[in-house]
Amino acid sequence: MSYNTNDIMGYAQDPIVFSNEQGGNELYEKVKEVMVHGINENGLPATIFEDTIKSGGMFGTKCPLLMIRHSDSSCRFFMIGIFVYGNQVMFALFGESAENTKYNRKQYYQENGNFIKAALIKPDEFKLQSELQWREDILNVFNNATH
């Protein structure tokens, strides 16, 4: 399944720019090596697979995409998609997060004064914290290797 930039649900962190790297496929291969090694070395619950992401129409840009999802299929977390555009490494979120969606919906209703609807939505705080911790652990693999 090829992804499109329209499939991006947000970003896990800001892009990281490498000024001394060539970028492109060479940088992507280095990122892939760091992530696969780091996730395995740290024993993180993750399944890694490769795909592509496309931007624009029929003649748009296509880039390799490293997808990381939680290895427990009962955990409905966002997937993290890492791709390189030029000399920037991007960390996009794909798919759906059940608890994050509930939390955002509750926040939206509270901010817009609909407190009755907000009171009816009850995200599981433990699951939400678990997802945020998992995401942070995955991102730390890359951040610790590059700093």
Question: What label would you give each PLM region?
Answer:
Residues M1-H147:
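A composition-biased, non-transmembrane "mature-region" signal
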